[in-house]
Amino acid sequence: MSSSIFGPLTGFLERVNSLNAPYQALSYDEQKAMTIWQRVKFYNWTFELCALGVLFLVYAFYKFGNSVNLKRGNQIFQSLHSFLANDLKFSRVGFNINDSKIFTVEHQNTWFSSFATGRSAIKSINLNLHLVARSNPFSMCLEYLLGFFFASLKSKQLEEFMEIVIRPNGILVTSESAHPNKNAHEILTKFRFVTSIVNKEFMNQARTENYFLSIAHTSENDKLPNNFVYMSDVNQLSGFMFHYSKPYEVLSQAGNLLKYISFTDLPVNPPRDDKEWESSIEPKAIIRCAVPQNENELKLLNQIISLVVEIYDGFTQDLVQQSPNLFITNDILKRTTNLRQQELNKIKKFMKETELELAKEKKLELEKAKRRQLKASGQQEKVDQKMKEKRERRLKNKQRTRFQ
């Protein structure tokens, strides 16, 4: 077995050494008599040149992969920033535009991030782009092969996606001279629900990866294109998006791009305790989609973002102005609140069970430690004898009581 593994390697090393067999055959005096230029000409540099060639290829792949990711990131964020600033009228978009740092780049040009803020009804928009690390094609190919043959070993770093998180602020400003409403906190309490439009192909993965979708109910409707379904914690919420916008045309074109749009106040990861539950409750809309590949898909992504902003505009306006056409009724909010309380009770129950298990384990460890100490001091036999006598007395008392 070892010869079959190391045999080719040994043969390769021998061939490398044989490249300079004539030079190594020279005696010390012969090498000493040669000038530096003569040694350079006589020496076989094949192996060194091949090594330099490999290093150059690695560096070239690294630079090329990084440049490809950076070019795609620039193209996507320039389109998004222009749309957010000019069409949706956000007052601040991106980072330092003067230094051309309109987005941040991390992890060898694989994670791109930016934001927008300063607008009525919207607190902020976070833009996140993840691309495959093209700087190391050998590692990328190996991970693809492992993921293809062993699904459990598939790396999440191989998935390319775009995620946009839009957070409302509960503030309505209809004009530059208008005063904002002062009950923003109260308005935001009306955003506590989950309603989503999810691509059927991504539905199972979405449930697995997102806690807020794992507790949602699935339903279909003629208003949706065939490749999308509703996922909401209350069935009446399915019409929420259509009440404040007309998304059918955009959705019918976004079958290959959009994975889901979700309005939620619940976190992505399941809370482990009640404190984490309370701290993670935050109203937001999450858009998850594939990475746009061309100008048409970039325009489509901009339209999807515009739909969500339009929905938040309309919903916030109805809440602030107490419109009779308000879609989210007190009955719906009561039902969503009850569902959240049920989920919180499950978490608390799990916490108590976990604490009891830990207490039992700790008690068992203490008893074992105590027994080891008694055994080491020679007192264990006396303790066992006392326990035995105690059990016998209890048994006799029970028998005596029974006969009486």
Swiss-Prot record:
Classification lineage: Eukaryota, Fungi, Dikarya, Ascomycota, Saccharomycotina
Classification via InterPro entries: CCDC47
Record's protein name: UPF0674 endoplasmic reticulum membrane protein YNR021W
Record region (Disordered): 369-404
N-acetylserine: residues carrying this PTM: 2
Disulfide-bond pairs as recorded: none
Signal peptide: none
Similarity comment text for this entry: Belongs to the UPF0674 family.
Location(s), subcellular: Endoplasmic reticulum membrane
GO CC term, one of those recorded: endoplasmic reticulum
GO MF, one example: calcium ion binding
Topological category with respect to the lipid bilayer: Single-pass membrane protein
Domain of life: Eukaryota
Organism: Saccharomyces cerevisiae (strain ATCC 204508 / S288c) (Baker's yeast)
Ranges that cross the membrane: 49-68
Record: glycosylation sites: 44, 98
Alphabetized UniProt keyword annotations: Acetylation, Endoplasmic reticulum, Glycoprotein, Membrane, Transmembrane, Transmembrane helix
Further comment: Present with 34906 molecules/cell in log phase SD medium.
